[in-house]
Design a protein with these regions (language model features):
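A conserved acidic beta->alpha catalytic loop
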Residues: 67-76, 131
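Hydrophobic helical membrane-anchoring modules
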Residues: 1-32, 55, 188, 212-274
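Short, acidic, metal-binding catalytic loop of nucleotide-sugar glycosyltransferases
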Residues: 51-60
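Acceptor/aglycone-binding surface of glycosyltransferases and processive sugar-polymer synthases
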Residues: 93-94, 99-118, 123, 135-219, ...
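Acidic helix N-cap motif at the loop->helix transition within catalytic regions
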Residues: 44-48, 72-81
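Short beta-strand/loop segment that forms part of the nucleotide-sugar
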Residues: 37, 60-70, 97-98
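Active-site beta-to-alpha loop of glycosyltransferases that engages the nucleotide-sugar donor
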Residues: 37-51, 69
Length: 274
């Protein structure tokens, strides 16, 4: 039943500056963490994103780009960038998963996250390639995950301290808040940013969820994954972030994705009641 969810385990980390990047204990900084970054026509954004991530004081961080055969050459750009980023032991800090079928953001994430866990990541971070998610918050999110034992840490736009880009108009901001309230109300959760895509998962949580069982192809993947984590009693923490608008390229949101996002919470609720 929906009411059986462990809502007390949905909590927020103390509010902090959206640009904060606290130093981690050395052992924590070396924790195997893989950033999974789906791409489609992100040639203009990817080089800058790679430099930001590789410049973080997180020796354990690896980047897995999941490219859906981008016609603008993003996949080859990713391969070229990977050659220039090696760990101290000579192993690559960046790799590329090439997919031949463009069948949705959710499926790209699922493929990348499964590979990351298979390759030994202790934590997996979902991150957009368009610069909307703040790389400066990754260390803080990892620290929260490791200090609390949370299965999921959400980079949240809607907890105290979280903010949205000024480039978003009032209509877009209202629509985003409505989408969060819509999904959370139907599913009976108190996660403030259930639709957000900047999420850090423990490998344990991902194995328990079983990525192959996730049915969402598009953006509703974010909602389905969080709901499944709560159903399995994993603690969910939320850390405030500032969400930027992309400056290069176009959004991949389309009508089919929007319709799936409307229908998916009802499907998840119906399955939970069986």
């Amino acid at each position: 039943m929906i009411g059986e969810q462990k809502t007390p385990r949905e909590t927020s980390a103390p509010a902090a500056s959206a640009t904060a990047s606290p130093a981690l204990p050395d052992a924590w900084a070396h924790t195997p963490l893989t950033v999974v970054m789906p791409t489609y026509n992100e040639a203009g954004n990817l080089p800058g994103m790679v430099e930001l991530l590789m410049g973080l004081e997180l020796p354990g961080l690896r980047l897995l780009v999941v490219d859906d055969s981008s016609p603008d050459g993003t996949g080859q750009i990713a391969e070229d960038l990977a050659e220039g980023h090696l760990a101290e032991d000579g192993t690559p800090r960046m790799s590329v998963l090439h997919r031949t079928t463009k069948d949705g953001l959710g499926r790209a994430y699922a493929a990348g996250m499964a590979k990351a866990v298979e390759d030994g990541a202790a934590y997996v971070l979902q991150m957009d390639a368009d610069g909307s998610h703040p790389s400066a918050k990754i260390a803080e999110m990892l620290g929260v995950a490791m200090s609390t034992g949370a299965g999921l840490v959400v980079g949240s736009r809607y907890v105290p301290g979280g903010t949205l880009s000024d480039a978003w108009g009032a209509h877009r901001k209202l629509l985003s808040r409505w989408a969060n309230a819509y999904a959370s109300t139907i599913l009976g959760t108190r996660v403030r940013d259930i639709t957000g895509g900047f999420n850090m998962w423990s490998a344990e949580a991902l194995r328990a969820i079983d990525l192959a069982s996730v049915g969402s192809a598009g953006y509703s993947f974010q909602v389905e994954m969080k709901f499944k984590a709560l159903r399995r009693d994993f603690q969910v923490m939320e850390v405030p972030i500032h969400f930027e608008d992309r400056t290069v390229g176009e959004s991949k949101m389309n009508l089919a994705v929007q319709l799936e996002s409307i229908a998916m919470p009802w499907k998840l609720r119906a399955r939970a009641r069986r």
